[in-house]
From Swiss-Prot:
GO molecular function term, any single one: cyclic pyranopterin monophosphate synthase activity
EC number(s) from the headed UniProt entry: 4.6.1.17
Gene encoding the protein: moaC
Lyase in keyword set: yes
Name of protein: Cyclic pyranopterin monophosphate synthase
Length: 161
């Protein structure tokens, strides 16, 4: 059997493979991802007053993000299905510049991390905001989606600066 390359999901000859985590001891793991959805002041006003045609944007985006976290292994080919113990998406509505900052947090006790679940939760929540606001604004921007915190596992704790 060939040794693994530097990328954990690739064999020496370049074939993709799912990492075997069966030998790892379960540990408590957390990942937090942040993103920003930039909208116009007019769109933000409609969002704050729950006056957009599709309804309550932030509640819908929260539910969509949590649902997406639970289905990450169905979307990312080499991602392990996990028993998620906690998932949440939080929002901060900002007037200047007009935007919605969001933070997705996912936790588990398991043999692999939840970074992908948090990324998919944040991206899906952001895309849901876009979907629910696109009737009134087409040039919405989703930006700065990134891992800001991760704990647990062999690599330990990571905090973005």
């Amino acid at each position: 059997m060939k040794e693994r390359a530097a990328f954990s999901h690739m064999t020496e000859d370049g074939a993709v493979t799912m990492v075997d985590v069966g030998h790892k001891n379960p540990t408590q793991r957390t990942a937090i991802v942040r993103a920003v959805v930039e909208v116009s002041a007019a769109t933000l006003d409609l969002l704050k007053h729950r006056a957009l045609p599709k309804g309550d944007v932030l509640t819908t985006a929260k539910i969509a993000g949590i649902m997406a976290a639970k289905r990450t292994a169905e979307l990312i080919p080499m991602c392990h299905p996990l028993a998620i113990s906690y998932a949440d998406v939080r929002f901060e509505v900002r007037d200047t510049p007009p935007s919605i900052a969001l933070e997705a947090e996912v936790r588990t006790t398991g043999q692999t991390g939840v970074e992908m679940e948090a990324l998919i939760a944040a991206q899906t929540a952001a895309a849901t905001i876009y979907d629910m606001c696109k009737a009134v604004q087409k040039d919405i921007v989703i930006r700065d989606c990134r891992l800001v915190f991760k704990s647990g596992g062999k690599s330990g704790t990571f905090r973005a600066e």
